[in-house]
Amino acid sequence: MGDKKSPTRPKRQAKPTADNGFWDCSVCTFRNSAEAFKCSICDVRKGTSTRKPRINSQLVAQQVAQQYATPPPPKKEKKEKPERPEKDRAEEERPDINPPDEHPVEQRDKDKSEKEQPEKEKKDREKEIIPAITKKPNSKKNRPKSDIHQSPPSERNSIQSGKSTTKTKNSHNSRPKLKNIDRSTAQQLAITVGNVTVIITDFKEKTRTSSTSSSTVTSSASSEQQHQSSGSESMDKGSSRASTPKGDLSLGHDESF
């Protein structure tokens, strides 16, 4: 045992010689000079092996004053008050532990019904939005027709009568077919509302419709002019016939005298 301790002793003595007499405080680990008998920070004597610091009376007094400055009694009263109702609550909650388990099915049904109602409302709104969107292209298609055929009232009357006949026909058919439209000029527009996508196809009118309508108007106008001219010719002939017998009568009277 003595042999083991012998090599450790010279090592302890060698440290101060290597550090030129400086020593580390065993409490605050501050490196003091060799001349200092006590630590310059914590006033611990040189060579003490304990790390327990000395109790400073001033610091202890300050800490005690801070502890008593905060009012601990109201905290204790708050803790004591809920302790009594907690026991009462525990007794009241014991019979109520089972009832929430008895009605889980009703709560689930209510939750499902509440979730289904907004979903149905969303679907109804989407259905209302879709027809409003589908009506837009029809209004666009009808506008150019009114712009093209704004000449005489006779054409408007004929167009209105044609529209009325087409409406009556379309009322019977579930899906009306579009007429006087070039299928080659198809423009598709995709509109998405929520999870529903609506595709709208726009078609342009044929150029022949305007020429045929103008030709029909000109033919009707020419027929009216022919009727008027024939009526005027018949009136001229009647007037000439009525004038000739009067002249003959006048001549006969002259001859008799």
Swiss-Prot record:
Keywords tagged on the record: Apoptosis, Cytoplasm, DNA-binding, Metal-binding, Nucleus, Repressor, Transcription, Transcription regulation, Zinc, Zinc-finger
Biased composition (Low complexity): 209-233
GO cellular component: cytoplasm; nucleus
Pfam families (alphabetical): YAF2_RYBP, Zn_ribbon_RanBP
Top-level taxon in the UniProt lineage: Eukaryota
Start-end of RanBP2-type zinc fingers: 19-48
Biased composition (Basic and acidic residues): 74-129
Residue ranges, compositional bias (Basic residues): 169-178
Location(s), subcellular: Nucleus; Cytoplasm
GO molecular function: DNA binding; transcription coregulator activity; zinc ion binding
InterPro entries noted in UniProt: RYBP/YAF2, YAF2_RYBP, Znf_RanBP2, Znf_RanBP2_sf
Keyword Methyltransferase: no
Any single GO BP term: apoptotic process
Function per UniProt: May be implicated in the regulation of the transcription as a repressor of the transcriptional activity of E4TF1.
Designated name of the protein: RING1 and YY1-binding protein B
